[in-house]
């Protein structure tokens, strides 16, 4: 396949030599395995059309199914956010944070199933538990292109059942000479209430070569600041019960419940808590990269690169909320919709002066990514070449302020006598009845009613380090045959540490009136005007806000005045800040050795060009995981059916914790086969077979065992832990597609894919002894009491009473406790841990049309993906069930104009409803979290004022779409919110 090796080098050189200065394109090393064809003549195109043509050429000339995005011009990617650009690719959907693209789903497989590499190198993530990459950390200005490998290949790193996504950056020797591009823009985010309406963004890229183009340097830098707001209404979780349920947490079956479900095969769900929140965010991104290249000879090139990115996110949020006590309320009333799965149209409770809570949040997080790498390429002969690549990369995250990564200080008035919530519109309508006056009439809030209640300061830090070395080579037997080979060693170290500082003063701590000087009356009226029901006049909108530091000062002064002790303290010495004295510390190490062979062969079949690529990859991985966990020394019995574990303490009374380490290992063989034939002129038929894997999450492979509760009954204790012995989730993939390249920059493709996936992770339970704990049940003293008294040994309360009355002088009896002693039975633990159990089949169809309307400058892209699976969430089950998260159809429609000095684009992206996960944070733990379908229109335009100066404009979410997250049906709102539109205007100067 030698004739496919030269197109990128040729087109890149011509592109940079051209007057239009298009993108820094990808090198052969960066696009390792993306096969190419040599062409006689290259017409250099920049802008939208040039970017789309380069992406089309990569797709056409690749083995397997590969889609790509190329920069439109030097320092100009199609979107300011990489994830926003990726969603334009067929089969790729994204999730958004604060209205901005964050993570990707490919062919129905969520972020944790997609591997992200940078210049072919596996990149670390800072998500602590999963392997999901956050594209929000990287600015797009220094990116030359992105390639999405949808089928497996032997020479592509493993880790992506959904896809492997490679991000390519600049290389100065690919485009000799001096080039520079500087840009500045103003960003107007319409969603912010308190932040600066206009924030700046700056970026620059510089590339130059010296010494007859044998030495090169490229420098990229960018700085972004953005203020935005998110206004949301949420239900923190739903309790789902069968119609015949009459136990705790149920719904009374009386006249106050209208249309309540009645039978065991009908279900009703009631909310746990309703909250309205106003959040303000300030985001700062700083990105930089330096690339140095030296080619001392025509056959040897060395590249040293360093990449650094920082992403600071600060949040201030205030909220008001109503907690529903359900069966503990004074009374309940409800009205329900019809159907087997019933949701409330109205749910109400009365209370005996319960709390009306308002939360204050102020926290922040800083993400830092660093990577340094060295690459050496050596052409040993005309037919043999080698590449040595090494990198050391890290990603870390942690708090950037004293309040930790998440904080909550609550203030409340204890004058709530009734709460009601009305569903049926997009926004749940919360109605509060407040009464603290003697006349019994509803009354507004007064400052003197407010007191400080509970608080939580959560803090964590995470870091992942990846050290990777790879030796690869290509041996060309002839112009039509070659073999790729390689050997790679990778070490991944992941650590996550955390601690909560929590004061459970939910019944109130300070005295009424102490907060009056520091709180301000506020209103949420008009803050949900884009949401149906957001301006309902019944809503509770009045509440109080404050600076969290002022409220903390009042609370700390109250503690001091009372001489009260804090239940927990943070680094500041009080209970009102975060702590870095971690009590949870989880660490994992993966060491992987891999080798691969890949045969490439070009031939003909009945006169038609055929390309075949056959490969195999072998990997061995060793896993070591350790976690810091409490240890226990004793078990005591109070005489009933409750037993309690005693945490082990040192001589100073401090808890003894130990790192509990576990190991695992696995190996795997991953074959791949790609075949394509040009069945007619410009019509390519393609078929692929491969096996790909995704490794288990770091939560699933964590070491250590955590006791679920220190109190347990006669049946034994419960605990949970990870399982480093898990093997990867493995997919067998089949792809077939037909592609018609009918004109310059235009094509139509239709593809079918199928994935048979095994080793999905479920849960298993094993029994065993932990900590060598003796308990008195069935022990020497217990049996002595049973024998002497003749009491039935199953009547634990009577046996315990006999021991206290007649055997209290035994050493095992200490006060009101009976301890287990040596020789007594060991406590049996049921330990729940992850296990490879489940299988699933996913298939789908991808359709893509890209069309240029001749020389008019107009063009369009339309694509859609339809995905199916043989597993889905069953709304008529309450028990645990296996599901696939993120599965959804998606579509894109893009119209563009690119001619002369003017470029413009309208892009509409749509994603259907999808299951985001099981569990809602509260309520029934098996309830689903679904995301409603979402469509967004973005616009952009640029005008080349001169050969050097370009003026550009962009608008994101210009229709100001809102988002909706729901439970078992759309009446069960979990969150609905509005983020607003964002507009950019700026200039770019290139020379």
Predicted regions, residues:
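Short, acidic, small-residue-rich periplasmic hinge/interaction motif at the N-terminus
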Residues: 26-75, 111
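Extracytoplasmic beta-strand/coil segments of soluble accessory domains associated
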Residues: 83-122, 150
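Short acidic/polar hinge/loop motifs at secondary-structure boundaries
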Residues: 122-150
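Outer-membrane beta-barrel transmembrane strands
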Residues: 163, 169, 185-187, 198-209, ...
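Outer-membrane beta-barrel signature, preferentially recognizing the C-terminal barrel domain
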Residues: 367-369, 588, 693-751, 755-757, ...
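C-terminal beta-signal and terminal closure region of outer-membrane beta-barrel proteins
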Residues: 505, 719, 775-778, 782-786, ...
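Gram-negative outer-membrane beta-barrel transporters
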Residues: 756, 761-766, 772-920, 954, ...
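C-terminal beta-signal and adjacent terminal beta-strands/loops
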Residues: 757-759, 909-919, 942-991
């Amino acid at each position: 396949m030698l004739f496919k090796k030269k197109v990128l080098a040729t087109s890149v050189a011509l592109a940079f030599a051209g007057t239009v200065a298009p993108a820094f394109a990808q090198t052969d090393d960066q696009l390792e395995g993306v096969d190419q064809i040599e062409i006689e003549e290259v017409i250099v195109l920049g802008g939208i059309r040039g970017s789309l043509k380069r992406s089309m050429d990569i797709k056409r000339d690749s083995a397997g199914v590969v889609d790509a995005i190329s920069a439109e011009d030097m320092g100009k990617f199609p979107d300011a956010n990489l994830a926003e650009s990726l969603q334009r690719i067929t089969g790729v959907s994204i999730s958004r944070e604060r209205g901005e693209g964050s993570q990707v789903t490919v062919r129905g497989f969520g972020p944790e199933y997609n591997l992200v590499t940078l210049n072919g190198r596996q990149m670390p993530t800072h998500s602590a538990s999963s392997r999901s990459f956050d594209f929000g950390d990287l600015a797009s200005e220094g990116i030359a292109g992105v390639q999405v490998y949808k089928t497996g290949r032997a020479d592509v790193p493993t880790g992506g059942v959904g896809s492997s996504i490679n991000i390519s950056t600049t290389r100065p020797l690919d485009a000799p000479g001096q080039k520079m591009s500087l840009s500045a823009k103003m960003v107007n985010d319409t969603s912010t209430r308190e932040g600066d309406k206009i924030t700046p963004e700056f970026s620059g890229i510089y590339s130059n070569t010296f010494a007859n183009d044998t030495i090169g340097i490229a420098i990229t830098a960018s700085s972004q600041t953005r203020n935005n707001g998110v206004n949301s209404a949420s239900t923190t979780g739903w309790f789902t019960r069968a119609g015949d349920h009459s136990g705790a947490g149920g719904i009374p079956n009386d006249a106050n419940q209208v249309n309540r479900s009645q039978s065991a095969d009908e279900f009703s769900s009631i909310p746990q808590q309703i909250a309205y929140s106003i959040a303000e965010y300030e985001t700062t991104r700083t990105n930089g990269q330096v690339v140095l290249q030296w080619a001392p000879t025509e056959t040897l090139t060395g590249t040293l690169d360093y990449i650094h990115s920082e992403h600071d996110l600060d949040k201030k949020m205030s909220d008001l909320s109503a907690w529903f006590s359900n069966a503990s309320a004074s009374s309940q009333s409800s009205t329900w919709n019809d159907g087997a799965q019933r949701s409330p149209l109205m749910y109400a409770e009365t209370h005996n002066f319960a709390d009306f809570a308002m939360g204050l949040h102020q926290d922040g997080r800083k993400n830092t990514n660093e990577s340094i790498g060295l690459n050496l390429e050596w052409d040993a002969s005309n037919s043999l070449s080698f590449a040595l690549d090494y990198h050391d990369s890290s990603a870390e995250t942690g708090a950037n302020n004293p309040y930790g990564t998440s904080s909550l200080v609550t203030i409340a008035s204890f004058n709530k006598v009734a709460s009601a919530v009305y569903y049926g519109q997009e926004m749940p309508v919360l109605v509060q009845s407040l009464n603290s006056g003697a006349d019994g009439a509803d009354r507004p809030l007064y400052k003197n009613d407010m007191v400080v209640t509970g608080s939580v300061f959560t803090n964590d830090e995470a870091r992942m380090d990846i050290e990777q070395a790879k030796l690869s080579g290509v041996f060309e037997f002839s112009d039509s045959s070659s073999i790729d080979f390689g050997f790679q060693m990778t070490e991944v170290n992941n650590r996550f540490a955390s601690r909560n500082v929590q004061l459970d003063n939910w019944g109130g701590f300070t005295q009424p009136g102490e907060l009056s000087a520091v709180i301000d009356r506020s209103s949420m009226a008009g803050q949900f005007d884009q949401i149906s029901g957001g301006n309902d006049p019944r809503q509770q909108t009045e509440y109080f806000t404050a600076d969290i530091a002022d409220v903390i000062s009042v609370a700390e002064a109250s503690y001091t005045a009372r001489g009260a002790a804090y239940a927990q303290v943070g680094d500041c010495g009080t209970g009102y800040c975060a702590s870095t004295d971690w009590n949870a510390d989880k660490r994992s190490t993966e060491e992987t050795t891999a080798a691969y062979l890949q045969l490439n062969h070009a031939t003909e079949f009945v006169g038609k060009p055929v390309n075949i690529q056959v490969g195999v990859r072998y990997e061995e991985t060793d896993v070591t995981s350790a976690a810091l966990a409490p240890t226990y020394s004793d078990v005591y019995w109070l005489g009933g059916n409750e037993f309690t574990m005693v945490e082990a303490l040192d001589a100073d009374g401090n808890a003894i914790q130990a790192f509990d380490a576990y190991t695992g290992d696995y190996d795997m063989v991953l074959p791949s086969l790609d075949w394509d034939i040009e069945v007619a002129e410009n019509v390519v038929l393609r078929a692929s077979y491969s096996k790909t894997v995704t490794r288990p999450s770091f939560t699933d492979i964590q070491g250590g065992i955590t006791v679920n509760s220190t109190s347990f009954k006669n049946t034994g204790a419960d605990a949970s832990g990870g399982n480093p012995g898990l093997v990867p989730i493995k997919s067998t993939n089949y792809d077939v597609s037909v592609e018609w390249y009918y004109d310059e920059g235009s094509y139509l493709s239709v593809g079918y894919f199928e994935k048979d996936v095994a080793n999905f992770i479920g849960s298993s339970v094993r029994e065993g002894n932990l900590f060598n704990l003796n308990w008195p049940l069935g022990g020497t003293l217990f049996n002595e009491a049973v024998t002497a008294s003749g009491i039935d040994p199953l009547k634990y309360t009577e046996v315990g009473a006999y021991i206290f009355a007649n055997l209290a002088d035994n050493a095992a009896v200490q006060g009101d406790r009976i301890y287990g002693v040596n020789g007594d039975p060991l406590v049996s633990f049921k330990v729940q841990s992850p296990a490879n159990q489940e299988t699933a089949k996913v298939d789908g169809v991808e359709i893509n049309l890209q069309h240029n309307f001749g020389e008019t400058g107009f063009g369009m892209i339309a694509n859609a993906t339809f995905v199916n699976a043989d597993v889905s969430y069953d709304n008529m089950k309450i028990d645990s069930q296996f599901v696939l998260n993120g599965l959804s159809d998606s579509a894109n429609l893009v119209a563009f104009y690119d001619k002369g000095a003017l470029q413009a684009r309208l892009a509409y992206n749509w994603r259907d409803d999808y299951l985001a996960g099981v569990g809602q944070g509260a309520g029934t733990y098996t309830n689903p979290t679904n995301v409603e379908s979402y469509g967004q229109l973005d616009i952009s335009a640029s005008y080349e004022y001169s050969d050097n100066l370009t003026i550009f404009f962009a608008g994101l979410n210009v229709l100001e779409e809102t988002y909706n997250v729901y439970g078992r049906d759309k009446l069960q709102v979990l969150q609905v919110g509005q983020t607003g539109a964002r507009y950019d205007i700026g200039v770019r100067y290139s020379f």
